[in-house]
Design a protein with these regions (language model features):
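Tryptophan-paired
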Residues: 1-6, 42, 60-64, 69-221
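Post-signal peptide N-terminal segment of secreted/secretory-pathway proteins
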Residues: 1-17
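Non-catalytic, regulatory and substrate/membrane-recognition segments associated with hydrolase enzymes
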Residues: 12-44
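Active-site-adjacent structural elements in enzyme catalytic domains
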Residues: 54-60
């Protein structure tokens, strides 16, 4: 790296982002001056320390699925697992900037540097199954509220701490870039949807976000 703007060509492959690895992070502190006595001047104020707020380049998604159909327990379930697809194959380092969220908000402003590295392809699939990823799943009827039961929901499962590469694109309402979410059922139609975080809609998946996804399976079809 020869200068600040060389950062815009750096990216991390999608395989760097999962719950078993240290997630790539970035932080940026501006207007820093190193004083002669070894202290710092931060935004014109003398200080003995520099606080660095790291922003993860991934998003965490916790999933809760509820159904009107009893799919059974972990040993005999018709529920196979879940799949996230249309995931970007890399995450640019600059998509983690700014590293501080907006005042009084969980949200961040759009990236401040344009990405100029290897082109991003949305061809990555992340599949989690009861058979191969049992620790991620918890079939638990206590997840159902009284209101859920009154609405004839009888089965629920939680999928915890799914780590996905963040996904940014300037046209946030472009659903062709959205991450697809599929509920995989055995010998039945597997329903799917496109993930969006706001009703605007916004199909991006922000860096450093923690999102809760609740899905209702009403009437799966046999195939």
């Amino acid at each position: 790296i020869t200068d600040y703007y060389a950062l815009k060509s750096i990216s991390y492959p999608a395989e760097f982002f999962d719950s078993e690895r240290v997630i790539p992070m970035i932080a940026e502190n501006n207007s820093i001056k190193v004083l002669a006595d070894g202290n710092l001047e931060v935004n014109g104020v003398a200080s003995t320390k520099l606080t660095v707020g790291l922003r993860r380049l991934a998003a965490r998604v916790d999933v809760v699925l509820k159904s009107k159909v009893d799919f059974g327990d972990a040993s005999s379930s018709e529920f196979e697992g879940i799949t996230f697809s249309n995931i970007p194959d890399r995450v640019p380092l600059v998509y983690g900037l700014p590293s501080d969220c907006l005042p009084s908000s969980w949200a961040y402003a759009d990236p401040v540097l344009p990405y100029g590295g290897t082109a991003i392809t949305r061809n990555v699939e992340r599949k989690l199954t009861l058979a191969d990823n049992a620790d991620c799943f918890k079939i638990d009827p206590t997840l159902l509220t009284t209101e859920d039961k009154n609405n004839d929901l009888v089965w629920a499962v939680k999928v915890k701490k799914v780590i996905l590469p963040s996904s940014f694109f300037s046209s946030k309402s472009d659903e062709t870039n959205a991450i697809n979410f599929t509920v995989n059922l055995i010998d039945k139609y597997s329903p799917s949807c496109k993930l969006k975080i706001l009703s605007d809609p916004d199909y991006t998946l922000p860096a450093n976000a923690k999102l809760d996804l609740t899905g209702i399976i009403r009437e799966p079809l046999e195939v």
